[in-house]
């Protein structure tokens, strides 16, 4: 990453190095952020309890655990397996400041109804359509047991997982019932759980979007909301859910599109609920320490790190309330369900670059009061307003370097790279000039880049309303060619998820008892030429924010001052002073 200004790149003589040092710390050396990050309630990591120390260091604020009926009550309704998710594991998470969210899934073998699905645990439970307080409703009995057991420790409950993963006799399916069957499952869970713990929150199942997209079906969520709207009793019970969860992988731009599709689908029926991005990631294919058995897309470890920051910023701008990365750490048992290495932490406990990128998001994307997507063209800009502090995230969306000018809020800012390294930069004539490295994660099927180039995070003290007010009215404006491209701001979705080769989840949960929860469905890529979904995001579900601070996109080749070179010269200048050398000493060229 490069911080640049509009000066020529020729090195300054030592006679002016000291003046530069006196007015700016642009060339200050990069500093790596250290120490644990306070838990950020916005950001989660699936199964953080498998690496609790790393989770604490990363600032993970919440985690999800699968509470599998088939594993917790393997022998009947009076049985309980305390080793599946031991209480000390839960207690450690809570003590470390991480909220635990329960995922209720997998019908017990003794509770399945007829006909039994190829994956028996995907079968709807017996007695599902009986009243929730009827002893014959086995699902209600389980929900009552588990919510009672964890009351006061687990408050959020997700009801099942990825029911849209269905195609023929696919053994990866986790729900063999209809949309109507799922709605009944949700209603029973809602009524039962609220009776036990009125403060609990019931979440609609996470969906993948791409399974229906691939097979040309109407989106599962659209069909579900149609069913809900047809139930006259639903409004009186707040539609039987408190939040929606979704799972989006690999392609950064689809996060905006899919979240707005969900909003539009809800709003069409008069429903408005919070949205959680409960699974997201772009696992690397080039980690020599974890060569994947299957590869969805060629993703480098650096691109995975870029994805974490971009996905987090864009999800917040789209209106997501919380974001969770799948997942915290690779495990030896992952080979059956996770052919790709999703972990922020490797199996040997070393950190991937994505871990440090997660730290950046957890450290700087806090207390967000308002998030806007201000620029979406060759470059992207997301602004996160935290009241007295403003965080701006920028990245390049094309395959060539781009340089942008960002109107300043303060006289100086902290510039953060995806590695977590920071430096202080100074505004010049009321702007920061930033070089954005090119995007490299090319989608060979759809075209375009799935992930932008390495992002830059600009942190300023001051409200977003002060953007650009520091400009000196007498300053000479920087000359820009009249035909220079200029990024235009937008706060509306500009693209519908395109029906091409997209990650298709292969849901293959196992039923092997284990003291920790096993991963949920993970995506793999399958080429498809299916048509674009007929339901698309509309402006009715977009933020009403007025775009702010559209940066000028400078033409390629604009001279830029390399920060590392500046730091070298600054250090050399200080050395000269300390050595008592004359100011007019002949300039030496830096080592190459």
Residue ranges of model-derived segments:
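Ser/Thr-rich, Proline-interspersed low-complexity disordered segments
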Residues: 23, 28-37, 467-558, 562-564
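Noncatalytic carbohydrate-binding groove/subsite architecture in carbohydrate-active enzymes
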Residues: 179-312, 318
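Boundary/entry segment of secreted carbohydrate-active catalytic domains
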Residues: 33-68
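C-terminal membrane-anchoring or membrane-association module
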Residues: 569-592
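Carbohydrate-binding surface patches
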Residues: 374-413, 417-420, 461
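Aromatic/acidic polysaccharide-binding cleft in carbohydrate-active enzymes
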Residues: 285-358, 373-376
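C-terminal beta-strand-rich structural cap/linker in extracellular carbohydrate-active enzymes
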Residues: 426-473
């Amino acid at each position: 990453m490069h911080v640049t200004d509009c000066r020529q790149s020729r090195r300054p003589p030592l006679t002016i190095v000291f003046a530069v040092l006196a007015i700016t710390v642009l060339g200050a050396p990069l500093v790596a952020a250290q120490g644990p990050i306070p838990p950020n309630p916005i950001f989660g990591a699936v199964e953080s309890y498998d690496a609790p120390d790393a989770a604490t260091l990363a600032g993970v604020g919440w985690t999800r655990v699968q509470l599998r009926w088939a594993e917790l009550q393997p022998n009947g309704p009076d049985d309980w397996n305390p080793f599946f998710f031991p209480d000390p594991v839960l207690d450690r998470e809570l003590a470390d400041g991480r909220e635990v969210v329960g995922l209720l899934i997998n019908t017990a073998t003794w509770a399945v109804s007829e006909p039994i699905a190829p994956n028996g645990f995907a079968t709807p439970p017996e007695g599902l359509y009986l009243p929730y307080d009827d002893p014959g409703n086995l699902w209600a009995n389980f929900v009552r047991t588990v919510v009672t057991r964890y009351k006061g420790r687990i408050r959020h409950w997700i009801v099942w997982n990825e029911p849209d993963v269905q195609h023929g006799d696919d053994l990866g399916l986790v729900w063999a019932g209809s949309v109507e069957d799922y709605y009944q499952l949700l209603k029973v869970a809602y009524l039962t759980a609220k009776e036990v713990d009125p403060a609990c929150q019931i979440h609609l199942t996470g969906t993948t979007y791409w399974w229906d997209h691939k097979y040309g079906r109407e989106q599962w969520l659209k069909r579900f909301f149609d069913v809900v709207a047809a139930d006259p009793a639903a409004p009186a019970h707040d539609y039987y859910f408190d939040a929606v969860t979704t799972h989006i992988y690999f392609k950064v731009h689809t996060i905006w599109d899919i979240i707005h599709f969900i909003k539009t689908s809800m709003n069409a029926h008069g429903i408005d609920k919070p949205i959680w991005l409960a699974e997201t990631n772009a696992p690397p294919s080039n980690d020599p320490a974890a060569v994947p058995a299957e590869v969805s897309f060629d993703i480098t470890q650096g691109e995975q790190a870029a994805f974490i920051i971009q996905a987090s910023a864009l999800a917040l701008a789209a209106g997501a309330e919380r974001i969770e990365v799948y997942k915290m750490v690779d495990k030896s048992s992952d080979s059956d369900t996770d052919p790709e290495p999703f972990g922020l932490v490797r199996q040997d406990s070393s950190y991937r670059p994505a871990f440090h990128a997660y730290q950046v998001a957890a450290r700087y994307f806090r207390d967000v009061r308002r998030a806007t997507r201000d620029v979406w063209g060759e470059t992207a800009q997301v602004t996160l307003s935290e009241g007295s502090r403003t965080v701006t995230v920028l990245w390049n969306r094309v395959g060539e370097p781009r340089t942008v000018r960002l109107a300043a809020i303060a006289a100086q800012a902290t510039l953060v790279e995806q590695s977590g390294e920071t430096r202080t930069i100074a505004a010049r004539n009321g702007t920061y000039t930033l070089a954005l490295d090119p995007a490299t994660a090319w989608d060979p099927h759809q075209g375009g880049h799935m992930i932008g180039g390495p992002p830059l995070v600009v942190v300023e003290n001051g409200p977003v309303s002060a953007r650009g007010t520091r400009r000196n009215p007498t300053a000479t404006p920087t000359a820009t060619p009249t035909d220079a491209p200029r990024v235009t701001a937008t706060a509306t979705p500009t693209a519908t998820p395109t029906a091409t080769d997209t990650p298709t989840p292969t849901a293959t949960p196992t039923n092997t008892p284990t003291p920790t929860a096993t991963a949920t469905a993970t995506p793999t890529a399958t080429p498809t030429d299916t048509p674009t979904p007929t339901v698309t995001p509309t402006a009715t579900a977009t933020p009403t924010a007025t775009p702010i601070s559209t940066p000028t996109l400078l033409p390629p080749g604009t001279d830029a001052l390399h920060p590392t070179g500046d730091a070298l010269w600054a250090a050399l200048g200080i050395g000269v002073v300390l050595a008592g050398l004359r100011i007019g000493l002949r300039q030496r060229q830096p080592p190459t």
